[in-house]
C-alpha cells in the first residue's frame, strides 16, 4: 500500500520558493509571541489544483545555493535572553507555539531522539550536522537516506533545523534525528503520469517504526497520508505505542471535516493507546488552514500547530515556504522533544496529556470538531499543570497565595523563600514562596470602632446583673458583642459587685458571650478605661482581628490584692489568602483559646495590674494564617501585661500599659520549621474630668498596637534540590521567614465628652501613623461625633 505526502501532493497544499539564493539556516527564541520577521518576498502562491499533483517545480527555478558552511562546534547553552533573536521571530511555528518558554528553561531537544519517517534528508546540508543518528537508514531499498524530493529535508528542518542566527530554525533545534527513508526507489523522481511523486509502502513504514523503537526514539513524526493503515503497519504502530513512543501523523490536506483515513488510526484505542496525535494546521493567526482536514471524528486526539508558510530548505538546501499539515506535525514532534528533555521522567502518555491540557483553546469552547484539543502552546505546557505540591510531600502549594500576614507583622519583607514544587505530572519547578505571602488588608479604623444603631440594655435581679447589646436587623434583632456605654461604666462595677455577692464577700464570677475574658476581668475588678475609640490599651484586645465567643472569669480578693482567673474561646479573623474568596468574605475563622491570670492592687489613687496570658492558636500565628504550602503554622504564645492608672486629683487621670509577648511557632505539614516570635504593645494617656463644666471630660492617648519585634521569624527547612533519577528531594536548605515589619503603627487620639439634653455628646479625633505597621501607607486621620441617649 503506497502513501503520499501531506503537503503539496494533496489538493490545497502549496510550496513557494523564496526569492533568495542564500542557504537556509536557524536561530533562537523569545517569550511573548510576536509576528515573525518577514521572509524575502515569495512568489505568489499558485492556485491549488483539485486533484493530487506531483511536487511542483518552483518557478523560477532556484539559483544553486552556496556551499554550506561547516557545522559550528557545539557551545554551552546561551543565556535565556539570547534566544529572542530575529531568527526566532522569523520561525513562525516556534513563535506561535511560544517556544521561548522552553528555551529559557534550557530545553532545546538535546539528547532526545526523534524519528522522521519520510523521503530522507539532505546529507550535504549543514543544518543538521552530527545530529543525524548513525542508525538512520532507508527501509525501502534505497541505497542512501539522501533526499530526492525535498519533503523529508523540509520536515526534518522544521523539527530540528539548526540555530545559527540566519533565516529560521527548527522548533527543537538540538534534537537528534533518526531518519528513515521510506519512499519507494525512483518514485520521487517521477514527475508525470498517475504514478508521479513519492510513494511510501506500509511495510517500509512499519519497518521504520520498529527501528525507531529499537533505537530509543521518544517520538516519531509521520508526515504522510492516504488510505487506512494495513495490518502490518497497524501491528508496528501497536508495538511502538506499547513501548511508550508518541507518534505524530499529519491530518491531511483535503480540507474535509475529518482527518485523513491513515491518521484515523489514532481513534483505535487498542492500538494507539492515546499516543497517536493527529496534527492539523493553522496559520499564525490561530485560524484553521483552508487546506487542513478538521478534527471531526478524531477531535480527542487532534492538536493544531502552524503549517502555513513554513520556511525550510529543500533537498538542494534552497529555502522555500511550505504549506501543509506535513509541517504542523514536526512542530508538535519538536515540542514533545523539548518536553522530554526538560522533564526526563515523563512517560509518553504524560507528554501527550500535557500538550493536550495546555493547548490554547480555539473555535468552540473545549474540545471541538475543528481544532480538536486546541493549538500548541509551549508557554502553557512548560508551566505547572494541575495541583502543585511541595517536593517530597503531598502538601498542596498555591502558585499565588500561601499565606497572609496579620497587622502585627505589617509589611514584613522577605528576602526570598525559594523552594521546589511539583505539578500534577511530578515536574519540578522553583517557586519563591515569599511572593505568595500577602499583607493584611487594611480596614478603615472607624468601621470597626463605631457600632452603628445599637441599643444597650442592662438590668439587675437580686444579686445578678445582665447587660445585652441589641442591633436591629431587617428580620430580627441580633445580640452582638457587649459594649457598655460610658454611662454604664459605673454599672459595670455593680455587675461585678452583684456577682461577687453571689459567691460570697470575697469572690465574684462572670460568664459571657461575645465578650473577651479581659473585659470581664476588668468588670469584676471594678476597672473602667477612658472611652477612646482607636487608641486601645494592650489588654483591651489580642492585637489582631478576633471574635471572642465564650468567656468566664473568677476573681477573689486576698487581703488588698485581687486575683483573677479568666478563660476565653473564640476565632481569629484571619485574612483570606485566596483572592476570589477574599472578595466574598475577606475573613476566615480560625479557633483559639486563652487563659489569663491577673494580680491587681490598689494604692490609694494608684491602681495596678499584672497579667500573664497563655494563647493557643489552632491554625494561625498572632493572627496570620499560613497555608499548607508554608507549613500550616501553629502557635502558642505567652504574654505579660503591666498596667497602672493614677487618679492624680482635681479630675486628672494618668494611665500606662505595656505588653511583651513570646510566641513559639512550628510547622505541621510538608517540612520542618520553627521559631520564636517576639512582640510588644504599649499605651499611655492623660485625661481630666471637668474641663468646662463639672461633667465633661477630655483625654489624650498615644498607643502602639501589637507589633512583632525586630529579628523575629521562622526558620524553615525547604526542599531545594530534586533528583529526577530517584524522584526524591536530595537536599533541604534552611531559609528565614521574616515576620518583623519595618513600619511601626502609632495611634494618637483625643477625646471629649459632654452631657447634652439628657444624653452624651462624644467626639474623637485620631491619627494613625503607618497603619497596620505598614510604612508605605499614608497616615490615617479620622473624626467621630456621636450622641447617645439613655432610656
Question: Where do the PLM segments sit?
Answer:
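Outer membrane beta-barrel transmembrane domains
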Residues: 528-541, 564, 576-589, 596, ...
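Protease zymogen maturation seam
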Residues: 25-111, 126-127
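Substrate-binding/access-modulating region of protease and related hydrolase catalytic domains
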Residues: 25-38, 108-109, 182-273, 315-323, ...
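Outer membrane beta-barrel translocator domains of Type V secretion systems
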Residues: 442-645
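Subtilisin-like serine protease catalytic core
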Residues: 76-80, 100-134, 142-201, 229, ...
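Extracellular S/T/G-rich loop segment that most often corresponds to the catalytic His/Ser-adjacent loop
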Residues: 118, 126, 265-337, 341
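Hydrolase catalytic cores
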Residues: 158-159, 180-183, 218, 307-373
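C-terminal subdomain of the subtilisin-like protease fold in secreted/lumenal serine endopeptidases
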Residues: 86-94, 98, 210, 217-221, ...
Amino acid at each position: 500500500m503506497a502513501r503520499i505526502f501531506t503537503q503539496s501532493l494533496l489538493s490545497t497544499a502549496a510550496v513557494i520558493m523564496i526569492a533568495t539564493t542564500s542557504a537556509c539556516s536557524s536561530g533562537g527564541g523569545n517569550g511573548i509571541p510576536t509576528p515573525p520577521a518577514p521572509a524575502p518576498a515569495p512568489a505568489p502562491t499558485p492556485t491549488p489544483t483539485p486533484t493530487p499533483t506531483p511536487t511542483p517545480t518552483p518557478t523560477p527555478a532556484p539559483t544553486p545555493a552556496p556551499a554550506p558552511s561547516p557545522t559550528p562546534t557545539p557551545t554551552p547553552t546561551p543565556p535565556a535572553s539570547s534566544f529572542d533573536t530575529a531568527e526566532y521571530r522569523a520561525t513562525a511555528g516556534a513563535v506561535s507555539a511560544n517556544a521561548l518558554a522552553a528555551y529559557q528553561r534550557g530545553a532545546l531537544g538535546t539528547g532526545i531522539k526523534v524519528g522522521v519517517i519520510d523521503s530522507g534528508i539532505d546529507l550535504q546540508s549543514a543544518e543538521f550536522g552530527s545530529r543525524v543518528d548513525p542508525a538512520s537508514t532507508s527501509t525501502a531499498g534505497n541505497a542512501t537516506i539522501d533526499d530526492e524530493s525535498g519533503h523529508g529535508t523540509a520536515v526534518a528542518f522544521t523539527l530540528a533545523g539548526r540555530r545559527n542566527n540566519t533565516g529560521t530554525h527548527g522548533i527543537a533545534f538540538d534534537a537528534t534525528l533518526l531518519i528513515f527513508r521510506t519512499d519507494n526507489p525512483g518514485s520521487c523522481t517521477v514527475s508525470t503520469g498517475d504514478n508521479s511523486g513519492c510513494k511510501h509502502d506500509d511495510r517500509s513504514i512499519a519497518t521504520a517504526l520498529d527501528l525507531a523503537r529499537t533505537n530509543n526514539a521518544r517520538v516519531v513524526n509521520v508526515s504522510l497520508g492516504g488510505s487506512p493503515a494495513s495490518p502490518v503497519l497497524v501491528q508496528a504502530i501497536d508495538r511502538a505505542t506499547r513501548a511508550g513512543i508518541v507518534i505524530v501523523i499529519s491530518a491531511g490536506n483535503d480540507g474535509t471535516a475529518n482527518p485523513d483515513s491513515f491518521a484515523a488510526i489514532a481513534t483505535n484505542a487498542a492500538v494507539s493507546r492515546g499516543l497517536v496525535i493527529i496534527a492539523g494546521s493553522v496559520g499564525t493567526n490561530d485560524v484553521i488552514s483552508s487546506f487542513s482536514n478538521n478534527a471531526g471524528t478524531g477531535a480527542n486526539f487532534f492538536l493544531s500547530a502552524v503549517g502555513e508558510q513554513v520556511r525550510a530548505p529543500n533537498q538542494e538546501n534552497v529555502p522555500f515556504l511550505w504549506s501543509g499539515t506535513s509541517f504542523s506535525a514536526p512542530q508538535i514532534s519538536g515540542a514533545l522533544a523539548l518536553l522530554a528533555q526538560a522533564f526526563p521522567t515523563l512517560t509518553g502518555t504524560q507528554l501527550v496529556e500535557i500538550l493536550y491540557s495546555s493547548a490554547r483553546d480555539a473555535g468552540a469552547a473545549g474540545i471541538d470538531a475543528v481544532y480538536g484539543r486546541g493549538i500548541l502552546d509551549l508557554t502553557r505546557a512548560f508551566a505547572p499543570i494541575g495541583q502543585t505540591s511541595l517536593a517530597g510531600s503531598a502538601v498542596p502549594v498555591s502558585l499565588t497565595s500561601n499565606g497572609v500576614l496579620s497587622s502585627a507583622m505589617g509589611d514584613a519583607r522577605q528576602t526570598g523563600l525559594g523552594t521546589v514544587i511539583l505539578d500534577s505530572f511530578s515536574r519540578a519547578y522553583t517557586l519563591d514562596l515569599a511572593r505568595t505571602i500577602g499583607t493584611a488588608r487594611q480596614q478603615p479604623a472607624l468601621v470597626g470602632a463605631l457600632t452603628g444603631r445599637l441599643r444597650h440594655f442592662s438590668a439587675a435581679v437580686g444579686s445578678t446583673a445582665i447587660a445585652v447589646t441589641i442591633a436591629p436587623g431587617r428580620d430580627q434583632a441580633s445580640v452582638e458583642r457587649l459594649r457598655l456605654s460610658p454611662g454604664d461604666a459605673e454599672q459595670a462595677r455593680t455587675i461585678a459587685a452583684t456577682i461577687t455577692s453571689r459567691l460570697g464577700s470575697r469572690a465574684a464570677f462572670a460568664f459571657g458571650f461575645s465578650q473577651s475574658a479581659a473585659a470581664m476581668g476588668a468588670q469584676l475588678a471594678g476597672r473602667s478605661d477612658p472611652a477612646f475609640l482607636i487608641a486601645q490599651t494592650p489588654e483591651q484586645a489580642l492585637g489582631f482581628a478576633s471574635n471572642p465567643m465564650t468567656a468566664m472569669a473568677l476573681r477573689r480578693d486576698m487581703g488588698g490584692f485581687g486575683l483573677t482567673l479568666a478563660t476565653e474561646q473564640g476565632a481569629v479573623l484571619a485574612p483570606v489568602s485566596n483572592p476570589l474568596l477574599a472578595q466574598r468574605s475577606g475573613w476566615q475563622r480560625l479557633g483559639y483559646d486563652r487563659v489569663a491570670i491577673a494580680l491587681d492592687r490598689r494604692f490609694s489613687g494608684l491602681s495596678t495590674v499584672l497579667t500573664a496570658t497563655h494563647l493557643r492558636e489552632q491554625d494561625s500565628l498572632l493572627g496570620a494564617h499560613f497555608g499548607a504550602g508554608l507549613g500550616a503554622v501553629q502557635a502558642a504564645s505567652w504574654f505579660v501585661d503591666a498596667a497602672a492608672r493614677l487618679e492624680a486629683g482635681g479630675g486628672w487621670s494618668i494611665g500606662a500599659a505595656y505588653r511583651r509577648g513570646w510566641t513559639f511557632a512550628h510547622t505541621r505539614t510538608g517540612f520542618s520549621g520553627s521559631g520564636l516570635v517576639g512582640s510588644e504593645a504599649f499605651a499611655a494617656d492623660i485625661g481630666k474630668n471637668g474641663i468646662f463644666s463639672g461633667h465633661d471630660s477630655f483625654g489624650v492617648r498615644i498607643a502602639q498596637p501589637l507589633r512583632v519585634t525586630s529579628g523575629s521569624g521562622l526558620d524553615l527547612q525547604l526542599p531545594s534540590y530534586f533528583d529526577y533519577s530517584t524522584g526524591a528531594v536530595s537536599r533541604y536548605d534552611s531559609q528565614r521567614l521574616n515576620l518583623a515589619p519595618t513600619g511601626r503603627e502609632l495611634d494618637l487620639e483625643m477625646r471629649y465628652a459632654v452631657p447634652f439634653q439628657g444624653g452624651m455628646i462624644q467626639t474623637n479625633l485620631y491619627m494613625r501613623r503607618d497603619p497596620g505597621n505598614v510604612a508605605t501607607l499614608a497616615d490615617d486621620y479620622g473624626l467621630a461625633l456621636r450622641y447617645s441617649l439613655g432610656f
